[in-house]
Amino acid sequence: MFAAEPRRAVLDHGRALRGNPRLINVLLVIDNFDSFTFNLVQYFGQLGVEQRVFRNNEITPAEALALNPDRVLISPGPCSPAEAGVSLGMIEAFAGNKPIFGVCLGHQSIGHFFGGHVVRADRLMHGKTSPILHHNSDLFKGLPQGFKATRYHSLLVERATFPAALEITAETAEGEVMGLRHRTLPIWGVQFHPESIATEHGMNILKNFLSLN
């Protein structure tokens, strides 16, 4: 029995999958106290993913490793990476071991962990959409250029000090970093919210993550 238990019951979607959860992706979700986390959980559930959800103060990296998830999601949140509980510790624990996906604060946490600077954005974005320009690879494979994505953030990973270990995979027309990946490890992040109803092709981004290793 682990010291930490999931905040929500394990989400088991699909009667045919019951009894053999290893047939599907098991996703560990680190919830940074954000309402958008539920939307992400719902979307991944629609894709048939079993999930274990913990708030960022409910589980340690060692306990998370013992759960042996297939993938890790670091959720959005209202704070900075330094204030995001165990989020940075989860990146350290799982980097190179399991695929990691960071959304908004999770994306910023990846940038921060690998040496980037997370700074105040020139523009406060609260429920606004921007066209996204991307490299048509990994998370963005098969997506049209300039698809609209919803943004809720006042911080972003600074382009001028972007860490060498990471690569920019998406941006706005103004050059703001909207997507990143590690150059050699299975780690990806997006600054915008793929789970927002106003984001185009959000479900496809999540599907693409599930196909990456």
Residue map of PLM features:
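A generic "structured core" feature
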Residues: L28, S35, L47, V53-R55, ...
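Acyltransferase
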Residues: S196-N213
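Catalytic beta-strand/loop cores that center a nucleophilic Ser/Cys/Thr
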Residues: D138-T184
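Cysteine-nucleophile active-site neighborhood
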Residues: N25, P69-G142, L206-K207
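Structural signature of beta-strand start/N-cap positions in the alpha/beta core
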Residues: V26, E50, D70, P99-F101, ...
